[in-house]
Swiss-Prot record:
Keyword 4Fe-4S appears in the UniProt entry: no
Major place of residence: nucleus
Matches recorded under Gene3D superfamilies: High mobility group box domain
Listed InterPro entries: HMG_box_dom, HMG_box_dom_sf, SRY, SRY-related_HMG-box_TF-like
Subunit structure: Interacts with CALM, EP300, HDAC3, KPNB1, ZNF208 isoform KRAB-O, PARP1, SLC9A3R2 and WT1. The interaction with EP300 modulates its DNA-binding activity. The interaction with KPNB1 is sensitive to dissociation by Ran in the GTP-bound form. Interaction with PARP1 impaired its DNA-binding activity.
Keyword match Transcription regulation: yes
One MF term in the entry's GO annotations: calmodulin binding
GO biological process terms held by the UniProt record: cell differentiation; male sex determination; sex differentiation
Protein name: Sex-determining region Y protein
Function field: Transcriptional regulator that controls a genetic switch in male development. It is necessary and sufficient for initiating male sex determination by directing the development of supporting cell precursors (pre-Sertoli cells) as Sertoli rather than granulosa cells. Involved in different aspects of gene regulation including promoter activation or repression. Binds to the DNA consensus sequence 5'-[AT]AACAA[AT]-3'. SRY HMG box recognizes DNA by partial intercalation in the minor groove and promotes DNA bending. Also involved in pre-mRNA splicing.
Residue ranges flagged as DNA-binding region: 54-122
Length: 232
C-alpha cells in the first residue's frame, strides 16, 4: 500500500515538473535572440528567409514610420495603407532636422549591423515581370468602322461601312457601276455615306439590312462613264 502511494506521488511530481517546463519552452520570448531581434527590426519574415533573400536595412524614415504607422492604423482603422503612407510622408517632411536626428542614428546602427552580418551584400532590386505580347488579334467589334476608297475623276472618295450587310451593299454598288448605264459615282457615294451615318446603331439587324439593300440613285446623263471609274 505504501509502495503504491509512493509510485503515484512520484508520477504526479513528474507531471507537475514537466508542465512548467513545457510552458516555459512554449512562451519563452523569442526576441532574446539577437538574430531574431535584427529580423524583427528589418521586417524579415519566414518566406524571405526561406528564399535566402536578404532585405535592405531600414533608413531613417522607415525607422520613424514603423511606430507611427501602427498608431495611425489604430486611430483610423478604415484608412487604406496607401493613404497612411501619404500622411506619414507629409508628417516626416514637417519634422525638423533635430527631430529627425535620433532616427538617422538608429538607421546607421542598423546599417552597421547589416554590414557585419552580410559583408558581401549588394542591393539587387526585383524586376517587374513584363506582360507577354500576344500574336493573336482581338476580334473587331460589330460597330467598328471599316473604310475603303474609290477613285473617281482622279480623286479618292472614302466609303465607310460597318458590318457584312454594308459590305454587301458596297459590293452591289460596285456591280451596278460596272454595268453599261452611266452614273454619277461621287454623288452616289456621298449619299450612301450620309445614309450610313444617319442610321442609328441601335437599329435591329433586319431594319439595317432593309436600309442598306436600297439601290443608290442613278443619274442617266451625268458626268462619268464606266471607263473613268477605277476600283482598287
Amino acid at each position: 500500500m505504501f509502495g503504491v502511494l509512493n509510485s503515484n506521488d512520484h508520477r504526479a511530481a513528474v507531471q507537475q515538473r514537466n508542465i512548467p517546463a513545457f510552458g516555459r519552452t512554449s512562451f519563452e520570448p523569442w526576441t532574446d535572440n539577437p538574430t531574431s531581434n535584427y529580423r524583427c527590426e528589418t521586417g524579415g519574415n519566414g518566406r524571405d528567409s526561406g528564399q535566402n533573400r536578404v532585405r535592405r536595412p531600414m533608413n531613417a524614415f522607415m525607422v520613424w514610420s514603423r511606430d507611427q504607422r501602427r498608431k495611425v492604423a489604430l486611430e483610423n482603422p478604415q484608412m487604406q495603407n496607401s493613404e497612411i503612407s501619404k500622411q506619414l510622408g507629409y508628417q516626416w517632411k514637417m519634422l525638423t532636422e533635430a527631430e529627425k536626428w535620433p532616427f538617422f542614428e538608429e538607421a546607421q546602427r542598423l546599417q552597421a549591423m547589416h554590414r557585419e552580418k552580410y559583408p558581401d551584400y549588394k542591393y539587387r532590386p526585383r524586376r517587374k515581370a513584363l506582360p507577354q505580347k500576344s500574336d493573336k488579334l482581338l476580334p473587331a467589334a460589330s460597330s467598328s468602322m471599316l473604310c475603303r476608297q474609290v477613285l473617281v475623276d482622279e480623286k479618292w472618295y472614302p466609303f465607310t461601312y460597318r458590318d457584312s450587310c454594308s459590305r454587301a451593299a458596297h459590293s452591289r454598288m460596285e456591280d451596278q457601276l460596272s454595268s453599261s448605264q452611266p452614273v454619277n459615282i461621287a454623288n452616289s457615294l456621298l449619299q450612301q455615306e450620309h445614309h450610313y451615318r444617319s442610321t442609328s446603331l441601335g437599329d435591329s439587324p433586319e431594319t439595317l439590312a432593309a436600309h442598306l439593300s436600297a439601290d443608290p440613285p442613278f443619274y442617266p446623263k451625268e458626268q462619268l462613264g464606266l471607263s473613268d471609274a477605277y476600283f482598287p
